[in-house]
Curated annotation (Swiss-Prot):
Protein name: Glycine cleavage system H protein
Source species taxonomy: Bacteria, Pseudomonadati, Pseudomonadota, Gammaproteobacteria, Vibrionales
Cystine crosslinks: none
Family: Belongs to the GcvH family.
Modified residues (N6-lipoyllysine): 62
InterPro entries named in the record: 2-oxoA_DH_lipoyl-BS, Biotin_lipoyl, GCV_H, GCV_H/Fam206, GCV_H_sub, Single_hybrid_motif
Family annotation (NCBIfam families): gcvH (TIGR00527), PRK01202.1 (NF002270)
PANTHER family named in the record: GLYCINE CLEAVAGE SYSTEM H PROTEIN, GLYCINE CLEAVAGE SYSTEM H PROTEIN-RELATED
Length: 126
């Protein structure tokens, strides 16, 4: 796992791209709990998302799960590959399975997220 990633309580990850944008996906732990992903509902480009609000939906053979925005901002890119290959979320949760890229409204929101070590400790308690 990339130690520069930040995580939410609801198992989303955030990669700071260093230019005021972030890439967002779901953690390996989350995809393991979901099982085989069969569909991903992507938001529209230019959609405004608010930290804590649902912006996407991932459906698996077991369940449908809302994906929550870790930060507030505007969607600048969506992972179109997930339309035809939703299994990328299972196969490459931190790489090919990313969901969106967002231009942040307030980069300070990243400070509220867990680092990789804190996140791993929290899921071991589950």
């Amino acid at each position: 796992m990339d130690k520069t990633l930040k995580f939410t309580e609801s198992h989303e990850w955030v990669r700071d791209n260093g230019d005021g944008t972030v890439t967002i996906g779901i953690s390996e732990h989350a995809q393991e709990m979901l099982g085989d992903v069969v569909f991903v509902e992507l938001p529209e480009i230019d959609a405004e998302i608010d930290a804590g609000d649902s912006f996407s939906l991932v459906e698996s053979v077991k369940a449908a799960s809302d994906i929550y925005a870790p930060v507030t901002g505007v969607v600048i890119e969506v992972n179109e590959d997930l339309q035809n290959s939703p299994e990328l979320i299972n196969e490459e949760p931190y790489d090919g399975g990313w969901i969106v890229k967002v231009k942040m409204s307030d980069p300070d929101e990243l400070k509220d997220l867990k680092d990789a070590e804190e996140y791993l400790a929290s899921i071991e308690e589950d």
